């Protein structure tokens, strides 16, 4: 056991309630600027991507390969407590709290100056869809993803699970559609809007501009 670890065996412990709130309430995540990541692989990816670690929880009696020294707080959870705070039934024996990255549009300015291709998601509603799009964006070499007026929290547990690590690999920014368009225009981006129409141009036939913004509309439209 880590020499500075704290054993928590009661599900009524305030720290346990804090974790549960972060998992279940987007308002808690936003107000505290924190999110929960489960599983050794995902936690290690977050650390490697320079996400700021806050605390880690490990099941009592288990061993993990994560470098726990980077976490200011280390908790050892009883089986009962771990079952309470684990969002997924298949979670490996580690759960961690990280500070969420700055997703404000102001934080995107330096990146937009050097980016060549970005993706804009308009009003996305489903965590699974966002996770899948993030994976595709990483595979396609997209430089950043912008969420315009999203209906979901990008740092919710279902997005993190469905992104399978992609959330740590690509910069993400959130804002209203009009402001996002203003920022992109200031950096000379050309918009390309996706459309399921027989007269739409194939992506393989388009001569892409030097700075490209691909826009995906809402799922229901």
Regions found by a protein language model. Give the residues of each.
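Boundary-proximal intrinsically disordered activation/regulatory segments immediately upstream
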Residues: 4-62, 151-152
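Short, hydrophobic beta-strand segments that form beta-sheet elements in well-ordered domains
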Residues: 36, 54-60, 190-195, 214-217
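Alpha-helix capping/helix-boundary segments
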Residues: 41-43, 62-63, 81-82, 151-152, ...
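Active-site cofactor/substrate anionic-group-binding motifs, chiefly glycine-
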Residues: 52-80
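Glycine/small-residue-rich loop that forms an oxyanion/phosphate-binding "nest" at active or ligand-binding sites
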Residues: 71-99
